[in-house]
Amino acid sequence: AGLTPYSVEALSCFIAGTKCEQIFLRKTEEEGFPETMCSYHRVFLGAALTGILPAPKCMIYTNLACDGNMMTFPYLKEKYSCPGFYIDVPYEKTQSSIKYVANQLKELKHFLEDITEKKITEEAVENAVTNSRKAAAHFKSQLALRKDHDPVTSLTNELYAIFMCHLLAGSETSLKYTELLLEDVKNAPKGEGLHVLWMHIMPFLQQPVKEAFNYSKTMHISACDFVADGFREMQADDPYEAMAEKMVHCIYNGSVSERIQMAEKLAKLTDADGGILFAHWGCKGTIGASGLIKKALEDAGLPTMILDGDGCNPANTSDGQVSTRLQAFAEMLEKNKEEKHS
């Protein structure tokens, strides 16, 4: 349709990288938004309220994953007098839910055609879904190799992966990314480092996290549930139902058991030594579920750490504390690994 998609999290992460996020956070406080709200959404709202954020042509949002969506987008829709499209994803993971969402996606196509005054062909929709299917297959293949291959990587690579499976899903770029990723993993040797399963988003900007994982040969992020879910395989033949299936079966929709099952599956697939669950400030769903996820995974034999922090606002987290906790967790995993092999 000729539109460039961007997200709250992506833009706020970029703004935080420029070190000027506090200006926008203060602006949202002045407007009465609670400090307990997700920092990504608060930075985004602040940027909009100060006028630095250009008015978009339209807004598309869902009730998936983040409850901040239901506050941010209706507010900005009114503020900008901007057309918006809301996709309601039912809690129940049934075929009727898939058909319900598929019908909304068909309406979304017409909505975008009206906004852009450009026709979106059914062939273009089919091609996008075909690309997504191929990308999911490549991603699944590289996950299966992670037990015996340890590519040296960085948090930036993980950030790219999130873009590819969400903002650029269905694109030729996303497909190319997974092809190259698969080749990189195939060519990477087996290392001696720890395999870590990361759950939820990553604090890409936090120095101790970068020091622990960037180009490290001692600790590797072998899988991330947020990314793996984004590259979910789709079974339905109809392209709209395939996309709807991906949304309905998202691990952030429905019971917390979905997230636990995904984590257990990824840990087994990649032979993870431990798991890190990032409890991002203001993410009520993850913070509320973190204790249940940790207990379930540890009962299944996967040592798990809940890492409290903020991926966007450094004022809400301590580098020293994060560094100490990561080091202690790594030492524990190393000890467990030595005992396992002795």
Model regions and ranges:
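Metallocofactor- and cofactor-centric catalytic cores in central/energy metabolism, strongly enriched
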Residues: 5, 16-19, 26-30, 34-42, ...
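Gly/Ser/Thr-rich loops at beta-strand to alpha-helix junctions
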Residues: 11, 63-69, 199-206, 281-288
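A charged, amphipathic alpha-helical module
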Residues: 102, 106, 110-233, 252
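Glycine-rich, highly charged phosphate/nucleotide-binding loops
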Residues: 32-50, 251-265
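C-terminal hydrophobic structural anchor segments
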Residues: 254, 259-301, 305
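Acidic/His-rich segments in extracytoplasmic proteins that coordinate ligands and/or metal ions
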Residues: 40-114
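Redox- and metal-dependent alpha/beta enzyme cores, enriched for Fe-S-associated oxidoreductases
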Residues: 1-26, 197-268
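Peripheral docking tails and interdomain loops at the edges
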Residues: 291-342
